[in-house]
Amino acid sequence: MTQPIIELHQVTKRYADNTILSNINLTLESGKFYTLLGPSGCGKTTILRTIAGFTDATTGDILFAGKRINDVPANKRNVNTVFQDYALFPHMTVAENVAFGLTLQKRPKSEIAERVNQALRLVQLADYGDRAISALSGGQQQRIAIARAIVMQPQVLLLDEPLSALDAKLRRQMQYELRDLQQRLGITFLFVTHDQEEALAMSDEIFVMNQGEILQSGSPVDIYDEPINHFVADFIGESNILPGKMIDDFQVAFGGHQFECADAGIPVNEPVEIVIRPEDLTLTDLAHAKLTVTINTQLFRGDYYEIAATDGLGNDWLIHSVNPAEDGDQIGLTFRPQDLHVMRFGEKEAEFDARLETYEGTEDDRFDET
Amino acid sequence: MKQKFTQLYLIVVFIILYAPIVFLIAYSFSQGDTMTNYHGFTWRHYQTLFSDSRMLAIVANTLLVALLSSLIATLIGTLGALGINRTTKRVTRESLLTLNNVLMVSPDVIIGASFLIFFTMLKIPLGFGSVLLSHIAFEIPIVVLMVLPRLREMSASMLDAAQDLGATTRQLLSQVIIPFISPGIFAGFFMALTYSLDDFAVTFFVTGNGFSTLSVEIYSRARQGINLEINALSGVMFLFSLLLVGGYYWIQQVSQKRKQRKRGAIS
Amino acid sequence: MIALTKRKTWLYFIPYGLWLALFVIAPVALIIYQSFFDLGHHFTLANYSTYFASATYLKMTVNSVWYALLITLFTGLISYPTAYFLHQLKHRQFWLLLVILPTWINILLKAYAFIGIFSQAGLANQFLTFIGIGPQQILFTNASFIFVATYIQIPFMILPIFNALDDLNPAFINASRDLGASNWQTFRRVIFPLTLPGVKAGVQAVFIPSLSLFMLTRLIGGNKVITLGTAIEEHFLTTMNWGMGSTIGVVLIIAMIIVMTLTGDQKPKGGAPR
């Protein structure tokens, strides 16, 4: 395994009685796109600031390429930040902003000019060097903020919710561009966001955070398909979360019935929660139904109908269907065993991973025919 | 109808505001010796003024005190504003601001009288030194008040960004903070200058016998009655104020234009 | 920001700190200290007992406050409509500049101008003669003192009211109209309450100086009106009774604190309603 570029070992941050970060461990490898994802106030920006050097960790170590950098001031760290409000210097032109860090390093004028031009080309604003910051649109300011950081050739680029001030269309475009930029530069990006779609779309690996803790880390697909607990399942994507009970390995009961599932290694009769994504539910006639629900309302979302329904036990269901349903109708729902995901209460990420080890492989054989 | 009333009201107010000034300057060109009955045009009073060596020395003193005190007050006030802006505790900041504003709201006589006691106790001789110190003292708070809002406008992330790009504390100050707040510093200097030129009461208390500024001189001459040399002086001072205001707005316009030129490049 | 900026930077704060100690705290302390000493430099409470026992001093104080109130009232009555109308003009910033410009003329020159205007054969009496009233003694009367003081203070009242009007979100006015309020109702129920902080700032800027305008009482009022400021100046520079002067100074400081408290912004601190 190669040397990780950034490591956090048991980092905590406290202000008086408030714990902002508790026991954060994380490892970032070179050249990957990482995302810290969580609701506002979960501590994700604080992690970014401890890595950048704007905030001290109360305890724990921050390592850069294996060396402890807790006591290295921000201006001596080889990481750069793109700020949420861009933080461009209003009294300087675009080029002066981008050149700022290089000027402080007293680089030769020709080198500065060339690197500034190169950085501006990278963000597709090559001709904008002479403009005032106030003359740029939000999207352009965003790009300049990125150019100003990457011109420093950092090994790690920290991005603090950089897209949050942009409109939806521009944000989607910037997602592609950021991903593209990261791959071209080949450096590590650590991206902070509260927008799960953004995180799923761009990241190699996501850290889901809540209340100062990292709850789960993994690839976007892993986290979407196998959320570790109620919070993660609810925060990422839309989901139906129902109380249930483990009957046996690969057998779970909920909604008054017993179903085949893809999870094992949980003690028999343990109360659990079951996650089913709305797009995994299929409308069917009552004869083929695994569950029967009554349609309450539906909204047309363009590429699908979002249907709200209630089952006989009073559980609410959210269904994404290509075909519309009729309000008030009784209708059948069906799903595949691997569409169910069983979550244990209070299970930690390490325990979850260990349990998965015990039955993985068998799972793939079982449902091959479907 | 309503429009008419509004206009009439404003016209009357402006006439009242400017009548005394126009009256004063008009009579500086009158051949008589009193401010009654205009006696025809003359430059005589201006000639008297410009050959009055005592008056010219006082003008020089006044300008020297104003410039010197404003420069020093701007320096100290800016540093003070930086300090106040750095305080994190709300209580500390509020009490510093309250103390800062004491001299802003105190009546001139209180400032003058208390400074007089202060200088006498420290055995500082009354004259140029005491006047200069007093002017610096009452100019500092206005500089702080002009600089602070600019400092507050400065976002914390901008300072983080500068550090992130490698700026040391010194570079942070010289390349980011000072350029950013320079409009505030400039306005502070300017306000300090006008406070100094305008002050009468404080100077009157702490000036002693040997030293005089324009305000004090005008007061003592006005108590002796009408003297059209003072009218001529007010003409000169009005022109000077106009130039100062004009210059101030011109500089603001230029910096605005510079911004706009850059902005204009977009289309 | 961490360690990087914490160190040594407090050195920059020293000149300002010295100023606070020597020119803000010390002088106030000294004037209070001095008020407890008599002419022979002995500690005494006599200054205060003299002040509160003497009809002359008390009458002077009441007079001074009364004149300051009148000046503030007249200034406000003239300034609010001026600021309001001014704010409706197209080039309002330019007109505001014209209001501020006279404040750049030395106050003594303006007072001096009125000596000319109000003199026996001056402009004002020529006008009175012209309309048939005949010449009057105008200079050295209480009325002339109030007139000139009001004249001098008007811009200082207009400015904060204008700024308050400028800060007012026009959407509030539209909302009020939308809800059926007439122009007058909109003014009384929306505009005036929301610009009250400007009026209070104006009162602060006018009332306190009006208590202490000693040069106007000398030049225009002809020593008929004795304000607190005049009394202080008299004691410090003429009779050299600094103890008594300081005592009146302390009274003036207390008056100032009362005015500041009454007109201070009553934003509920900590959200507790009062």
Swiss-Prot record, chain A:
It catalyses: ATP + H2O + polyamine-[polyamine-binding protein]Side 1 = ADP + phosphate + polyamineSide 2 + [polyamine-binding protein]Side 1. Its EC number is 7.6.2.11. One of its GO terms (molecular function) is ATP hydrolysis activity. The keyword Cell membrane applies. ATP binds at G38, P39, S40, G41, C42, G43, K44, T45. Keywords: ATP-binding, Cell membrane, Membrane, Nucleotide-binding, Translocase, Transport. Its main location: membrane. It is found in: Cell membrane. It is a peripheral membrane protein. One of its GO terms (cellular component) is ATP-binding cassette (ABC) transporter complex. Residues 6-236 form the ABC transporter domain. The complex is composed of two ATP-binding proteins (PotA), two transmembrane proteins (PotB and PotC) and a solute-binding protein (PotD). Part of the ABC transporter complex PotABCD involved in spermidine/putrescine import. Responsible for energy coupling to the transport system. Belongs to the ABC transporter superfamily. Spermidine/putrescine importer (TC 3.A.1.11.1) family. This is Spermidine/putrescine import ATP-binding protein PotA. It comes from Levilactobacillus brevis (strain ATCC 367 / BCRC 12310 / CIP 105137 / JCM 1170 / LMG 11437 / NCIMB 947 / NCTC 947) (Lactobacillus brevis). The gene is potA.
